[in-house]
A protein has these predicted regions:
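Short aromatic-glycine-enriched beta-strand elements
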Residues: 1-2
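Beta-strand/loop nucleic-acid-binding surfaces
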Residues: 9-23
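Acidic-basic catalytic patches of nuclease active cores, encompassing PD-(D/E)XK
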Residues: 22, 55-87
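Flexible glycine-rich surface loops and low-complexity tracts that mediate binding to linear polymers
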Residues: 27-40
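Conserved catalytic cores of phosphodiester-cleaving nucleases, focusing on short active-site segments
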Residues: 70, 96-127, 140
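Non-catalytic C-terminal interaction segments of nucleic acid-processing enzymes
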Residues: 144, 150, 155-157, 162-247
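GIY-YIG nuclease catalytic motif and its immediate N-terminal context
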Residues: 235-297, 321-324, 367-390
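Aromatic/basic micro-patches that form nucleic-acid/chromatin recognition or nuclease catalytic surfaces
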Residues: 242-243, 286-375
Length: 390
């Protein structure tokens, strides 16, 4: 639920989007509300937040409506010679968004995913773990062996991205699977290139070789709800599948202390911690998810790292993974200081060998960092750009 304000009046709104939307949810963001139709007795709110203004454009929030856009304006553009479109097609125990049949009688099974996370020229999906998306992808890979032409269509709903990458930071299992089972759909007509040349083009662009065709297209929407297809083919980059499967990278841990306290921190002795927010920067070249989950536990663990002494006192703890090819924890520590964080001297930085720009890996903030747009933009820059640089 989102609480909107019209002047001094608070309006509770349903948000029909399963993502985390961390790039959008800041006070003062302009929403587009749609009054719920009469007769819906189960509705808990009178309005639905169907869109948000972001970078002077409208970003749709109603992810399910991507299917309607696909049916009306996208599918015929990306799959040639379609003559039949059947929505919500059931096959065995599974239901797929569309079954399409082309003029040659080829049966196309299609799943549509709305993509609203676009930063630094890179669109990513999903922005929260999606077991359902993984299940559909695995089913499509199996069905492709039975003669179906299988597709996943990512409908990018704002901005002008240069490429699409599966989001290995928030759902590495899905990202690895998409790279394994998928290939970038060929934007060139079949008569212009042989299958071999098309495959060479895909491989050169990191497009994968799996059986499921992966499409990314750009939909632009106005504040009246009217949409048009701005680009039928956005480059699909599946080259980071091995990184997604490696479970390696960096992380930030956001910790809230409700009260000021004195804490004994191993060899550092007793440290005075003010009430407020702290962010810890770390890395793991293997078992990244386990490392983060260990930090999030307050009990039942031996104290190995400095952070282990702090987390039992936390009111809230949040892990922010950043999959990466390189160790970036010192770079992240520098970023935290640049954002105004106050270092806790030598905390977590004993292996930095006294790096002058890295006095600590733990920084204090008076306000919640994830509520600071500059902090979120830094996180997204590392996820969309820096972490993916070799």
């Amino acid at each position: 639920m989102i609480i909107a304000k019209d002047g001094k009046t608070e309006i509770p709104c349903h948000c029909p989007n399963p993502g985390r939307l961390i790039e959008f949810v800041f006070p003062g963001a302009r929403l587009i509300l749609e009054k719920r139709r009469g007769g819906n007795e189960k509705a808990k709110t009178p309005y639905t937040a169907v869109g948000i203004y972001y970078r002077d454009a409208v970003a749709p929030l109603f992810s399910a409506r991507a299917n309607k856009a696909a049916e009306q304006i996208i599918l015929k553009e990306i799959i040639p010679n379609i003559k039949e479109i059947h929505p919500e097609f059931t096959l065995g125990d599974s239901r797929f968004d569309f079954l399409c049949i082309d003029k040659k009688g080829v049966r196309h099974l299609i799943e549509v995913k709305a993509c609203s996370l676009i930063e630094y020229g890179v669109a990513m999906f999903p922005d929260a773990p999606s077991g359902r998306a993984l299940k559909h992808l695995e089913e499509l890979a199996e069905l492709s062996a039975l003669g179906y032409s299988c597709h996943v269509v990512f409908v990018i709903v704002h901005s002008k991205p240069e490429r699409f990458i599966p989001n290995l930071h928030t759902d590495p299992e899905f990202a690895a699977a998409l790279s394994k089972y998928g290939h970038a759909a060929d934007p060139w007509p079949a008569e212009d290139a042989t299958v071999k040349v098309a495959a060479q083009r895909r491989n050169a662009a990191g497009g994968g070789t799996g059986p499921v065709a992966i499409h990314a297209c750009l939909l632009e929407c106005g504040n009246t709800g009217m949409a048009h297809l701005a680009a039928a083919h956005i480059q699909v980059d599946l080259s980071h599948g091995e990184l997604a499967a490696s479970d390696a990278g960096n992380y930030l841990i956001q910790i809230e202390l409700a009260e000021t306290c004195e804490i004994e921190v191993g060899g550092l002795g007793t440290i005075h911690f003010k009430a407020g927010w702290y962010v810890y920067a770390g890395s793991a070249r293997k078992n990244l998810a386990k490392r983060i989950n260990r930090h999030l536990r307050k009990i039942r663990k031996q104290k190995h790292w400095h952070i282990d002494y702090l987390t039992p006192f936390a009111k809230t703890i949040k892990g922010l993974p950043i999959m990466s090819y390189r160790n970036l924890e010192c770079d992240l520590a520098v970023e935290l200081q640049r954002l105004g964080g106050k270092p806790v001297p030598r905390f977590g930085s004993s292996d930095c060998q006294g790096h002058p720009k890295c006095p600590s890996h733990l920084y204090y903030f008076k306000e919640r960092p994830m509520g600071n747009r500059a902090f979120v933009e830094m996180l997204l820059r590392y996820r969309h750009v820096v972490g993916l640089e070799g």
